[in-house]
Amino acid sequence: MSTDNKQSLPAITLAAIGVVYGDIGTSPLYTLRECLSGQFGFGVERDAVFGFLSLIFWLLIFVVSIKYLTFVMRADNAGEGGILTLMSLAGRNTSARTTSMLVIMGLIGGSFFYGEVVITPAISVMSAIEGLEIVAPQLDTWIVPLSIIVLTLLFMIQKHGTAMVGKLFAPIMLTWFLILAGLGLRSIIANQEVLYALNPMWAVHFFLEYKTVSFIALGAVVLSITGVEALYADMGHFGKFPIRLAWFTVVLPSLTLNYFGQGALLLKNPEAIKNPFFLLAPDWALIPLLIIAALATVIASQAVISGVFSLTRQAVRLGYLSPMRIIHTSEMESGQIYIPFVNWMLYVAVVIVIVSFEHSSNLAAAYGIAVTGTMVLTSILSTTVARQNWHWNKYFVALILIAFLCVDIPLFTANLDKLLSGGWLPLSLGTVMFIVMTTWKSERFRLLRRMHEHGNSLEAMIASLEKSPPVRVPGTAVYMSRAINVIPFALMHNLKHNKVLHERVILLTLRTEDAPYVHNVRRVQIEQLSPTFWRVVASYGWRETPNVEEVFHRCGLEGLSCRMMETSFFMSHESLILGKRPWYLRLRGKLYLLLQRNALRAPDQFEIPPNRVIELGTQVEI
């Protein structure tokens, strides 16, 4: 998205603050509290405070500023980012075996996101509502119900779209970051000694003094960079420069000031560890701060929900998830979508998590494994792109990868300590999603191969039909074909059972390209195969939704006139049965049958009028 289009650079930068930095921007609500809460065996001591502050600051510099904003964001596909995009880019110039490994890494990274997305809304909103413990301690029993109410309203408005509400996100988040900076600066001025923690030697001293415990404590430090993947995933919406500009001018200074302000407060008053963020504020500001914190966490949750919608659409379009209903909530912005099934499944999961864990401190124990796991995978995939696509020197790329992994692997390993205390949750959810995605992709491939393994040549069949035509009836018939050079099952069964053929036959294939968008000039390719047969291949990007009516419009512009209400669409509907398999493949087959039964049918998927569709069933053993 170029900054000279439609909006000015300041406007785009402000919008990026409102969407991209919601998650990482609400981390000060709980990060330092979890670091120094006593769970690691040391209390609010000067060396511990300085050590944690130094680690947080330099983690923000190295992971966010250097790794993601400077290096990873160079890897874009027509301006788009995200873990599946990175997977696609990394596999472009590699061997088939290497590509398979990279695809597995990308799918694991995407699955980790699904695991983490359940926790983000819960921990963000709960940590804000927990400000009630400071404002009115007697209301602490209302934290869980209020958190559920807030998130219920958020999930309910998803179907209406967020275009109108979204206009408020940017000014609210800008206000939030200014408040973070103001509260932190006020505390730092009162205790400037805390600025010594900017020296990275305090991080080194922390490890030397606390040894093994300091390593385990990295599991809490990583809370400061949760949401870092959003910087790369949302690159297509705002562009690289506005996201970088927002970070270095607003977000990084505000986060640094607030974390160090909390540290200054704790050095002066160790008892403030119960909630150092809210105790930074004067008494008169607690209620307004509670309100703005709740709004900021709702915005952070919205960004995550929108992110899971986008990831799901991309996975569906790339063939890793079954087709599902995707509703566009904005006529102007193709990225604003609503997926009902995903929305309500996520809502149920979030409510269960809130009721089960009851407090954001308990949830913090579940946070981090998926984030750091994705960071490791991002390092490997992005350096693969640097070597294979950008042709950087292999030794230089190796040094970059080693530098990244020297940070990522200790963070990931430290978070494994959380496995039994809550880390199993995102890991389990991620594992389920990985199984679902790999099952759909592999079983779909098996089905298509089974359907076409005994097929005749398309060209030979057309030549035979032209030479000895069956009864021809007036009108146009469109046969949906998953592959270009194979005979559609529906065509074979129509000839077998009805023994008729329309006077004009179009074989339509809708293809997803390895790009977010396809230009209208390249949308449709038309080839006349015989006097009465045409092949139409319509190409779409993975951020686009195929629409047959649009394809017909493009065909008309290219000289092949088609009228939707005068055309019959023939589609095959496969009734699947499982063949003989080992028990583990049989389980996978049963999962695929379940996914297939609940998948969105082709007429709904491609917006074809139901009264123009003729489905011909066939039984296939897989």
UniProtKB/Swiss-Prot annotation:
A single GO molecular function term of this UniProt record: potassium ion transmembrane transporter activity
Record's catalysed reaction(s): K(+)(in) + H(+)(in) = K(+)(out) + H(+)(out)
InterPro entries per UniProt: K+_transporter, K_trans_C, K_trans_N, Kup
Compartments it resides in: Cell inner membrane
Membrane-spanning residues: 9-29, 49-69, 103-123, 137-157, 165-185, 213-233, 247-267, 276-296, 337-357, 363-383, 396-416, 419-439
Recorded topology in the membrane: Multi-pass membrane protein
Major subcellular location class: membrane
Record family assignment: Belongs to the HAK/KUP transporter (TC 2.A.72) family.
Gene: kup
Annotated function: Responsible for the low-affinity transport of potassium into the cell. Likely operates as a K(+):H(+) symporter.
UniProt keyword terms in alphabetical order: Cell inner membrane, Cell membrane, Ion transport, Membrane, Potassium, Potassium transport, Symport, Transmembrane, Transmembrane helix, Transport
Protein name: Low affinity potassium transport system protein Kup
Annotated Gene Ontology cellular component terms: plasma membrane
